[in-house]
UniProtKB/Swiss-Prot annotation:
Record GO cellular component, one term: peroxisomal matrix
EC number from the UniProt entry: 2.3.1.42
Listed name of the protein: Dihydroxyacetone phosphate acyltransferase
Catalytic activity: dihydroxyacetone phosphate + an acyl-CoA = a 1-acylglycerone 3-phosphate + CoA; dihydroxyacetone phosphate + hexadecanoyl-CoA = 1-hexadecanoylglycerone 3-phosphate + CoA
Main location (coarse class): membrane
The entry's keywords: Acetylation, Acyltransferase, Membrane, Peroxisome, Phosphoprotein, Transferase
Sequence motif HXXXXD motif, location on chain: 161-166
UniProt KW Acetylation keyword: yes
Gene Ontology molecular function: any one: catalytic activity
Transmembrane segments: none
Compartments (UniProt record): Peroxisome membrane
SUPFAM superfamilies, A to Z: Glycerol-3-phosphate (1)-acyltransferase (SSF69593)
């Protein structure tokens, strides 16, 4: 068993306002004990495991059917027939032609779930996981709750997404516990992997195009296919809210398409309820860490192919530490909607007629998506390496070993006070914990003569697209640091606001916090419309860490809080500086541009500053950060987005760009938000 440690540090609550304490004073969470799935696998034949008696519990309202039956149900559904007739009238295309096209679409996307393929993957994955992972740890209580949930109502699994193996890992875990293997929404990229794509189909994967390009028939067939599986209770439906893997290891803002689809049967009263299960998958060491660094530096992602998969066999000789998979409590969609949503509008027209979602429903779907992601973040397990690398990145990339251990222990205490789920082995000395973390990540750090140094060659001397290995190594390290930012976001933004605000009046600090939260709302997960509560949570956590106190309408900083506030400000410094740097790029380089041109030119501009030594902000090289900044610039009016000849073009608003750059640099005061109420 692997049990997360309880906090050894004790911080008093300080003097946060009673409302803040009421809202955010959470009981110390009693984390479930984790079971290592691989422990039993190491003592029992993999073949015996794969061929075990597999009798998963079934949904009580299940409609028994085979994969082929689902396709027949979809093609004969009232909704598909209605859409085909509508399109036939609009395009003057024969109904039979459109029906054949719908059948081809179904053939392209549909799964062919078979127990034989599941057993094959169970055998192969058991061997691979034992080879590359020390442990695969799962919270048993979460599994027990899921076991009950799949029998009561349709279930939607919502895992975090950090690696290609996320969905394989989940299917392996569910098979191990005799739970129904899910049907999984996968990208069309995998279809290039011939034999592998067929195996994935037979293990439950169904394939969707990245964009539907306004293809009404494709959208109708795809959505009806997913809804049919959900209504029939065929199997749990699994997809990633983020839509794609996060290359920078921060949770990406949610995509709403699939979520809309799986919620619709409830909206139309076709099912009584639907359970959402947020799942948090945490890796000690990410398999694709170097690949991600190259991708966010502009190197194209390798095309998925069987040949590429075979070349990836080299990872079988590496150690990737442990994986922790936390199954959150099933969340009832009916409970979320109670008193929040009026479903009567769906009764006014026949179910088969597609409807445009009312604004209140759109807002509700958005709220549910962000809430599920916040639950994922809450249950992500944090390894000691995240603390170690964060300290090193703030200390000139090298430190005395004893000083590093001391600072890591300090950060451990702060992390636990902020509610981080930290996996720190209590049966080891701190020095051993830090040393074993460095050893696991020996491609990024080394211990030489009592000095810990981050390696700046990342095991490669290759220069790609003019990028030097140092940038690759730094971005690999940043990806681990970024995992801490999920739980540090709110107190860090308050700390930044305190640093940027002249005087410490609560109202002024809140205004600055609101501005920063708006600027960085594409970088981190914030529930829309929750600004005041986020501010109160950040203040409460800083009071809890004894970094500050509330005194009426003022904030008082404590002597003990200097280290905490300096650390938090430094933690977010790369994002503030990157956005400033990108503002300068817009002012000096471009009047208008397309997104692809922007990414290439912004990276070139940043690289020149790094080469000249006039900036050390290597985070600005990241395409993920550049895309997030562009989305923020559009929202803030720094650039205007227009569609020209079916392509989007961005026009720079010079004065607004200058103003934002000055506000981030504390050269211009931040105005009060119109809706600020404290």
């Amino acid at each position: 068993m692997d049990v997360p440690s309880s906090s050894s540090s004790r911080f008093s609550v300080g003097s946060a306002s009673p409302s803040s304490v009421l809202l955010y004073a959470k009981d110390l969470k009693k984390w479930d004990e984790f079971e290592d799935l691989l422990e039993e696998r190491r003592h029992i034949s993999d073949f015996k495991f794969a061929m075990k008696c597999y009798t998963p519990p079934l949904y009580r309202g299940i409609t028994p059917c085979k994969p082929g039956d689902i396709k027949s149900i979809v093609l004969s559904s009232e909704e598909i027939n209605y859409v085909i007739k509508q399109l036939s009238r609009e395009s003057l295309t024969g109904v039979d032609v459109l029906r054949e096209e719908a059948s081809e679409i179904l053939e392209e996307m549909s799964h062919k779930l078979r127990i034989g393929a599941i057993r094959f993957f169970a055998f192969v994955l058991s061997k691979i996981f034992k080879q590359i992972f020390s442990k695969v740890c799962v919270n048993e209580e979460g599994i027990q709750k899921l076991q009950r949930a799949v029998q009561e109502h349709p279930v939607v699994l919502l895992p975090s997404h950090r690696s290609y193996i996320d969905f394989l890992m989940l299917s392996f875990i569910l098979y191990s516990y005799d739970l129904p293997v899910p049907v999984i929404a996968a990208g069309m990229d995998f279809l290039g992997m011939r034999v592998v794509s067929e195996l994935l189909r037979m293990s439950g994967a169904f394939f969707m195009r990245r964009t539907f390009g306004g293809n009404k028939l494709y959208w109708a067939v795809f959505s009806e296919y997913v809804k049919t599986m959900l209504r029939c209770g065929y199997a749990p439906v699994e997809f990633f809210l983020e839509g794609t893997r996060s290359r920078a290891a921060k949770t990406l803002t949610p995509k709403f398409g699939l979520l809309n689809i799986v919620m619709e049967p409830f909206f139309k009263r076709e099912v009584f309820d639907t359970y959402f299960v947020p799942i948090s998958i945490s890796y000690d060491k990410i398999l694709e860490e170097s690949l991600y660094a190259y991708e966010i530096l502009g190197v194209p992602k390798p095309k998925e192919s069987t040949t590429g998969l075979l070349k990836a066999r080299r990872i079988l000789s590496e150690n990737f530490g442990s994986i922790h998979v936390y199954f959150g409590d099933p969340v009832s969609l009916r409970s979320l909607a109670a008193g929040r949503l009026n479903r009567n509008t769906y009764n006014l027209v026949p179910r088969c007629i597609p409807q445009k979602q009312p604004e209140d429903v759109q807002a509700f779907v958005t709220e549910v998506a962000y809430k599920m992601q916040l639950l994922q973040i809450e249950n992500l397990a944090l390894s000691p390496w995240l603390l170690v690398v964060t300290i090193l990145l703030q200390n000139q990339l090298s430190m005395d070993f004893d000083a590093l251990v001391e600072k890591t222990l300090w950060l451990k205490g702060v992390t636990q006070v902020f509610g981080g789920f930290l996996l720190w082995p209590d049966n080891k000395l701190p020095e051993e914990v830090v040393q074993s973390s460095i050893l696991l990540h020996s491609n990024l750090a080394s211990l030489v003569k009592d000095q810990v140094v981050l390696k700046m060659n990342s095991g490669s001397s290759q220069v790609v697209n003019g990028l030097v290995p140092e940038h690759i190594a730094l971005l690999m390290c940043s990806a681990y640091r970024n995992q801490l930012l999920n739980i540090f976001a709110r107190p860090s933004l308050v700390a930044l606001a305190l640093h940027m605000t002249p005087g410490l009046r609560k109202e002024d600090v809140f205004s600055c916090f609101s501005f920063l939260r708006n600027v960085f709302s594409d970088e981190f997960i914030f529930l829309p419309g929750n600004t005041l509560r986020d501010f109160e949570e950040g203040c409460y956590l800083l009071c809890k860490a004894e970094a500050m106190q509330m005194a009426g309408k003022d904030i008082i900083l404590t002597d003990k809080g200097t280290a905490v506030l300096q650390f938090l400000t430094s933690l977010f410094k790369p994002f503030v500086e990157s956005y400033q740097l990108l503002c300068r790029y817009l002012l000096h380089e471009e009047d208008y541009f397309g997104e692809k041109e922007y990414l290439v030119a912004a990276r070139k501009f940043t690289r020149q500053l790094l080469d000249q030594g006039s900036s050390q902000c290597y985070d600005a090289l990241s395409s993920e950060l550049q895309k997030n900044a562009l989305a923020a610039f559009v929202r803030l009016g720094v650039v205007e987005k227009k569609k020209v000849d079916s392509k989007y073009v961005y026009y720079v608003n010079g004065p607004a760009t200058s103003k934002l750059e000055e506000m981030l640099g504390c050269k211009k005061p931040i105005g009060k938000p119109a809706t600020a109420k404290l």
